From Swiss-Prot:
Gene3D superfamilies: HUPs (3.40.50.620), Isoleucyl-tRNA Synthetase, Domain 1 (1.10.730.10), Methionyl-tRNA synthetase, Zn-domain (2.20.28.20), Nucleic acid-binding proteins (2.40.50.140)
Name of the protein in its database record: Methionine--tRNA ligase
Cell compartments where the protein resides: Cytoplasm
Motif ('HIGH' region): 14-24
Positions of short motif 'KMSKS' region: 331-335
Organism: Pseudomonas aeruginosa (strain LESB58)
Entry keywords, A to Z: Aminoacyl-tRNA synthetase, ATP-binding, Cytoplasm, Ligase, Metal-binding, Nucleotide-binding, Protein biosynthesis, RNA-binding, tRNA-binding, Zinc
Positions that bind ATP: 334
Enzyme nomenclature, EC number: 6.1.1.10
One biological process term in Gene Ontology: methionyl-tRNA aminoacylation
Lineage of origin: Bacteria, Pseudomonadati, Pseudomonadota, Gammaproteobacteria, Pseudomonadales
Top EC class, one word: ligase
Amino acid sequence: MSEPRKILVTSALPYANGSIHLGHMLEYIQTDMWVRFQKMRGNQAVYVCADDAHGSAIMLRAEREGITSEQLIDAVRAEHMGDFADFLVDFDNYHSTHSEENRELSSAIYLKLRDAGHIDTRPVTQYFDPEKQMFLADRFIKGTCPKCGTADQYGDNCEACGATYAPTELKDPKSAISGATPVLKESLHYFFKLPDFEAMLKQWTRSGALQESVANKLAEWLDSGLQQWDISRDAPYFGFEIPDAPGKYFYVWLDAPIGYMASFKNLCARRPELDFDAFWGKDSSAELYHFIGKDIVNFHALFWPAMLEGAGYRKPTALNVHGYLTVNGQKMSKSRGTFVKARTYLDHLDPEYLRYYYASKLGRGVEDLDLNLEDFVQKVNSDLVGKVVNIASRCAGFIHKGNAGVLVGADPAPELLAAFREAAPGIAEAYEARDFNRAMREIMALADRANAWIAEQAPWALAKQEGQQDKVQAVCGLGINLFRQLVIFLKPVLPKLAAAAEAFLNVAPLTWADHRTLLANHQLNPFQPLMTRIEPAKVEAMIEASKEDLAAASQPAGNGELVKEPIAAEIDFDAFAAVDLRIALIEKCEFVEGADKLLRLSLDIGDAKRNVFSGIKSAYPDPSALEGRLTLYVANLAPRKMKFGVSEGMVLAAGPGGEEIYLLSPDSGAKPGQRVK
């Protein structure tokens, strides 16, 4: 028998500045299912996480609420832990990045990088708020767009016209925090020399540690050349001060991933069988997996392994990257009620409904997952209640009534039982590969076979016939054993259902190896309902409870878009005709390293190619979703040189900004290069 594997698993750290929602839960449920499977197999799997508790946003929110940053993060952490526990996410440790373990590790890793020559310093000029006495990130500066004149725009791009610019180009800049007019001020910043690790990263990203599509996207960034990474922020800042640099603090994204190590170190202090170096040492033979969303790949696949390499630690075995959650085919929306907080869901529905639905949809790729609420109700009611639980409810009564609750050991359908046992390796392989949807399909196919066989045997009819009682017990006994097999296969997904089934079956906690055995001459406990159907009214109530901003949406037309943004002054036809609008095909769309709001679009306009930067990242967090779409493009706008490259024109979008930006598309039949008239 092989030695148990040593596996350390993490999920991305939720930010300690807001509530957990169903999009977050996709990742934690996915990770929890995989870890539970590993533990059922007898492996030493350890699952750690923590709240990401540093940064200006936390400091400023705490200030607004009249509490300390520590009080804020403690309250949010307690809320997060309650949500996770009620969704049956079973962390071995849930810590905080604002911990002594993280302070010590962050400082030690930084000093190792510095002493090895991987840290650089240079002055950076930024806007400074003279009232708050703090430097301002781009998102904390607002002013008038230098291109279209729209007021109240952020410091790096205009949400009205899509233009991008440096904060210093804004007209009438103001601090979004205090309203004061900022001044330019120079400050010494600290940089991690990421280019030092380019060769290692090119090799590691192609080593099998990443899904192929993720590796391909990273190759584009690597081929375009890596830049040094700014790892410092100036006081005031809520975080850890950089050693030997008074008033300078680690940028939150430096100490956040180190929080994985800190949480594990905190656990090691309580569990002597765990050795920190055995999991994190340079020559560790343990496995290390990070489950993350595709929006933070660059931090985990470039900065993080480079930091670990430079500081003498091991690199991850693999990153397991997933897509985003949509609801009913659209982005989560507060106005539609589909931006559902974890607690709101829990107030209305059983967490195992969602755990199963996510499992039934999750593959090993990075595609987005859609929570279709009608399908959600139908699938849970059909699969879990109508198939799995139905087997036990059909059979248990006959065993209690006809044999005092004792399950006999007969096997009236050896081929069916063999099919269940033979399916186990394939289901295990699907779990291991994170092909949860394949595992669920195979399990439900077995449930269908079991139900069909029981219906064919019809124990309810046999029970009415003289001399058929032994057959009734044999049929129902096998039915309960098949139900037990299904519970074993579903236990990583449905731990609460499994615990209730174990109580009914009168057995110890089931392991994966138990699928090889049968219950025989075994006393069952009285059967209790294991799961109820989803009531559509409860789903509707959850959506209603999640709706926000409906009052604004229902205002009369006099308070509509034209009032918010009046029609501009008239122009003559010649002025309009001077703007050359073309149809463009988006061949490639990608993140811009170092830019909070920009996407880089490679456009085909018929006989030419164009490169455009557009401030639409907040509305399109998955850039690849735009690839292959047609859009409207201003072809004769003068090229604009930016720090990220040259933007050759502008794509057109509508909406007030933020998540509500809508890229314009032509009707079907339009072709790249055609002029809009």
